[in-house]
Regions:
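Extracytoplasmic metal-acquisition and chelation regions
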Residues: 1-141
Length: 141
């Protein structure tokens, strides 16, 4: 039934929230650099993540300034940040550029705002995408 499905899904979301909280409780350095837009402000606030991004919020800008790229590259180097993040449907050229200059890797953080046809056909849900994010964070933060 609808009510039972709703309750079950809410329970899964609550469990996932606890998993994120448990994960971040064990992470000393919570600084993330996004070579992309940053539509994750509430997520960052919830889990006390410091972040830097090439574009503010969901900006429609297409190119960051050279100064922004230099700042982010320096930040990655100075703080020993192991990964530069990008979001889904990004060409991640900015993230790749920063990561290459700093000698680190890149990784996808799925905002769950946009889902590809392939993801839909594979049965992607908010919970499954956030579970993937948690695994990616474990591997890259």
């Amino acid at each position: 039934t609808y009510a039972a499905n709703t309750e079950g899904y809410a329970t899964r979301i609550e469990a996932l929230d606890r998993e994120f909280a448990d994960f971040f409780a064990g992470v000393e350095d919570r600084t993330m650099v996004f070579g992309d837009r940053f539509p994750l402000r509430y997520f960052a606030e919830e889990f006390d993540i410091d972040y830097y991004a090439a574009f503010p919020g969901c900006s429609t800008q297409t190119e960051p300034s050279a100064a922004t790229i230099a700042f982010l590259t320096d930040k990655v180097r100075e703080e020993g940040i192991p990964t530069v993040w990008y979001i889904e449907f990004s060409n991640h050229l900015v993230a790749d550029s920063i990561a290459e200059a700093a000698g680190v890797k890149t990784a996808l953080f799925h905002t769950c705002h946009n889902v590809s046809t392939d993801e839909l056909e594979a049965g992607a849900t908010y919970v499954s995408l956030m579970e993937q994010n948690l695994e990616t964070l474990r591997e890259n933060l």
